[in-house]
Structure formats: C-alpha cells, structure tokens
C-alpha cells in the first residue's frame, strides 16, 4: 500500500515517516534524447496543426468521436422494441 521508496527513505532512528523526500531538478533538453526534436515543436506530429482549416477538422473529429457514442446510446434507448 505504501511506496517502497517512502518506506526506504524513512530514517530508522527518527519517528517513522511515510513522506518521501524528492528533489526536482531542471536541466536543458538533451538533443540526443529521443524525446526532444532539434527541428522544434510539432515536428513529430503526423499532421500539420498550422494549416488554415485544422481547427475545423479537429472540431469535426471531436464531434464525431464524442458524439457517436452518445448518439448510439440515444438511438438504442428510444428505438421501438421488436
């Protein structure tokens, strides 16, 4: 139930503590990393979000994706029983 790191980080001579001490560091992005692209942001996407009608295509994608399950549920709820 408790994190092993929290249990390991608790000192034995002090009262038992379940809080793990974390240190966050900030470093510059390593360009040799597979998670950072030297071409810049949006270079790894399979579509171009800077096109003229991207907003419309994205809106239609969301409407179809979120609207289809709702429309199917409503249709199945109100269809006549056979």
From Swiss-Prot:
Entry's localization field: Mitochondrion inner membrane
Q: Which residues lie on this side of the membrane: Mitochondrial intermembrane?
A: 76-82
The principal localisation class reads mitochondrion
Tell me which UniProt keywords the record has, alphabetically. Membrane, Mitochondrion, Mitochondrion inner membrane, Transit peptide, Transmembrane, Transmembrane helix
The family database entries (InterPro entries) matched by this protein are listed as: COX7C/Cox8, COX7C/Cox8_sf
In terms of SUPFAM superfamilies, this protein maps to:
Mitochondrial cytochrome c oxidase subunit VIIc (aka VIIIa)
Could you tell me which cysteines form disulfide bridges? Answer: none
* GO aspect biological process, one term: mitochondrial electron transport, cytochrome c to oxygen
Subunit structure and binding partners = Component of the cytochrome c oxidase (complex IV, CIV), a multisubunit enzyme composed of 11 subunits. The complex is composed of a catalytic core of 3 subunits Cox1, Cox2 and Cox3, encoded in the mitochondrial DNA, and 8 supernumerary subunits Cox4, Cox5a/Cox5, Cox6, Cox7, Cox8, Cox7a/Cox9, Cox6b/Cox12 and Cox6a/Cox13, which are encoded in the nuclear genome.
Protein name as it appears in the record: Cytochrome c oxidase subunit 8, mitochondrial
């Amino acid at each position: 139930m408790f994190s092993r790191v929290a249990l390991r980080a608790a000192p034995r001579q002090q009262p038992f503590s379940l809080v793990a001490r974390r240190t966050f560091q900030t470093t510059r992005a390593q360009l040799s990393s597979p998670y950072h692209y030297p071409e810049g942001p949006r270079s790894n996407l399979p579509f171009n979000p800077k096109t003229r009608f991207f907003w419309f295509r994205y809106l239609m994608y969301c409407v179809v994706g979120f609207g289809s399950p709702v429309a199917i549920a409503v249709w199945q709820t109100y269809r006549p029983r056979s």
